[in-house]
Swiss-Prot record:
Keywords: Cell junction, Cell projection, Coiled coil, Cytoplasm, Endocytosis, Endosome, Lipid-binding, Membrane, Phosphoprotein, SH3 domain. It is found in: Cytoplasm; Early endosome membrane; Cell projection, Podosome. Residues 18-249 form the BAR domain. This is Endophilin-A2. The modification Phosphothreonine is found at residue 298. Belongs to the endophilin family. Residues 243-308 are annotated as: Disordered. Implicated in endocytosis. May recruit other proteins to membranes with high curvature. Residues 306-365 form the SH3 domain. It comes from Bos taurus. PANTHER family: ENDOPHILIN-A2 (PTHR14167:SF63), SH3 DOMAIN-CONTAINING (PTHR14167).
């Protein structure tokens, strides 16, 4: 920084101290300017909070949001183009219904109904994904751009204006001790910054119909989603009612127990409900503990030496996305990195990946 720049910073700091501590009066801005500044501040707060609440509305599960953010970050680091999407609750419910519907089979009324409902839930999840994309493009992104560009630019102008005001007030207070030309230049710069800040705030407030248009796009996307959701659920309701009518019109099958077989109670080995029992092996003194010379070892995964960062799995973890590391309860995992407060990166049997911190107990922590 040049000598002139250092002097200017000293002037501003000196004036600020005299106003805050000494109670000195600074140049007052007009009421219209203050009113615009207040409206811009309220607009900035409104846009910031509405953005956060809209994301919560579209993706209500905070754990899933955090996991998705982490996976997207990892995908960018690895140069992967396709990022995993948010796991819609309708899709998870649909997969559950379809899985159990297939297990029950086609002869089960409930199984067939679960398959119908599961397919409809998956369609609802697809419609919800479309809502997410539509709202992001036409509502979230424009508001985020407003925050990052227009509002940020206004804050820059206001900060610059405050700095020039302090410089002008300091020099005005020392009038007669500094050249008149220097005081005149300070006043011109202050007036110039005030005009620039005023113009940018006026433009933002006068064009707020753009935000109304973006809000309208949000409502249109919601309406389209709910129309499609109602159509899908109406179709599902008709299918289930038709299944109920068909089931009630079919004759009921009566249960006919199979005839009991005659039980032969002559042999004690077959006295266990008619089923033959396996003969118990005889234990002799010569053979009963002979095998204890070589204890039986259960197969286990290779364990890393405990002098390096590692952890023990408390529960089974099934990976749902690329890059995650699956393991079973009791596995010992080598720790290589901590992604954030919720996720570790580690290795098991030569495989590397990410896994949640809450699923493991740290044995040897990572170096700080």
């Amino acid at each position: 920084m040049s000598v002139a720049g250092l002097k200017k910073q000293f002037y501003k700091a000196s004036q600020l101290v005299s106003e805050k501590v000494g109670g000195a009066e600074g140049t007052k801005l007009d009421d219209d300017f203050k009113e615009m500044e207040k409206k811009v501040d309220v607009t900035s707060k409104a846009v910031t909070e509405v953005l956060a609440r809209t994301i919560e509305y579209l993706q209500p599960n905070p754990a899933s949001r955090a996991k998705l953010t982490m996976l997207n970050t990892v995908s960018k680091i690895r140069g992967q183009v396709k990022n995993p999407g948010y796991p819609q609750s309708e899709g998870l419910l649909g997969e559950c219904m379809i899985r159990h519907g297939k297990e029950l089979g086609g002869e089960s009324n409930f199984g067939d109904a679960l398959l119908d409902a599961g397919e409809s839930m998956k369609r609802l999840a697809e419609v919800k994904d479309s809502l997410d994309i539509e709202v992001k493009q036409n509502f979230i992104d424009p508001l985020q751009n407003l925050c990052d560009k227009d509002l940020k630019e206004i804050q820059h102008h206001l900060k610059k204006l405050e700095g020039r005001r302090l410089d002008f007030d300091y020099k005005k207070k020392r009038q007669g001790k500094i050249p008149d030309e220097e005081l005149r230049q300070a006043m011109e710069k202050f007036e110039e910054s005030k005009e620039v800040a005023e113009t940018s705030m006026h433009h933002l407030l006068e064009t707020d119909i753009e935000q109304v248009s973006q809000l309208s796009a949000l409502v249109d996307a919601q309406l389209d989603y709910h129309r499609q959701a109602v159509q899908i659920l109406d179709e599902l309701a008709d299918k289930l009612k038709r299944r109920m009518r068909e089931a009630s019109s079919r004759p009921k099958r009566e249960y006919k127990p199979k005839p009991r077989e005659l039980l032969d109670l002559g042999e004690p080995e077959q006295s266990n409900g008619g089923f033959p029992c396996a003969a118990a092996p005889k234990i002799t003194a010569s053979s009963s503990f002979r095998s204890s010379d070589k204890p039986v070892r259960t197969p286990s995964r290779s364990m890393p030496p405990l002098d390096q960062p590692s952890c023990k799995a408390l529960y089974d973890f099934e990976p749902e996305n690329d890059g995650e590391l699956g393991f079973h309860e009791g596995d010992i995992i080598t720790l290589t990195n901590q992604i954030d407060e919720n996720w570790y990166e580690g290795m098991l049997d030569g495989q590397s990946g990410f896994f949640p911190l809450s699923y493991v107990e740290v044995l040897v922590p990572l170096p700080q």
